């Protein structure tokens, strides 16, 4: 409930499309019945992006706290995606916060058409990309490995950071056997 209220306050009047395992009365709701995985997560982002009626898409995750500034401070050009790098990570198994220079879908803002085109190429019905090879749009190491279009990605920094809560129930934890691979970022803190 707390996360929901923070998100609703942050997005203000922007329309909301939610993707959930069970039906929820929150914006336009898509019920996801597919097995939980990173591949499916991207397919659901594609599915939701096609329903968007605004020129830009901003993804939000239920385990991330967003300030209203995040959704208002920047829009990328129509031929690029952007990632807000001012994201502090909190790990439920570690008392230290960290900031790392790595793009994350939880802070993605992109032109709707550009994002749909990129996701269709990777995860659409005619995609030949293997389900075990996934990565953010604009992350060239994955795009090169998949032999797909290299997408433009811009790293931006909001004055007010987001806070991402990494926990044992998250897809990252289960799929990558974290916390062993979930390392702290370059900048560390014991309180924010």
Question: What label would you give each PLM region?
Answer:
Residues 12-22, 56-58, 81-83:
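Short, hydrophobic beta-strand segments that form beta-sheet elements in well-ordered domains
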Residues 2-3, 27-32, 72-75, 96-98:
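Short, glycine/charged-enriched secondary-structure capping and boundary segments
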């Amino acid at each position: 409930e707390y996360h929901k209220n923070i998100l609703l306050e942050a997005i203000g009047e922007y329309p909301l499309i939610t993707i959930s395992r069970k039906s929820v009365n929150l914006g336009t709701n898509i019920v996801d019945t597919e097995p939980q995985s990173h591949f499916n997560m991207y397919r659901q982002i594609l599915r939701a992006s096609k329903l968007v009626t605004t020129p830009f898409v901003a993804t939000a995750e239920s385990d991330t706290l967003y300030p209203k500034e995040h959704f208002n401070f920047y829009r990328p050009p129509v031929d690029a995606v952007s990632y807000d790098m001012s994201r502090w990570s909190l790990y439920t198994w570690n008392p230290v916060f960290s900031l790392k220079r790595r793009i994350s879908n939880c802070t993605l803002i992109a032109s709707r058409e550009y994002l749909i085109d990129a996701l269709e190429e990777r995860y659409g019905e005619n995609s030949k990309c293997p389900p075990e090879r996934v990565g953010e749009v604009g992350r060239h190491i994955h795009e090169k490995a998949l032999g797909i279009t290299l997408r433009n990605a811009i790293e931006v920094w909001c004055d007010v950071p987001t806070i991402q809560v990494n926990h044992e129930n998250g897809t990252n934890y289960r799929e990558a056997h974290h916390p062993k691979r979930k390392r702290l970022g370059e900048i560390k803190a014991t309180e924010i």
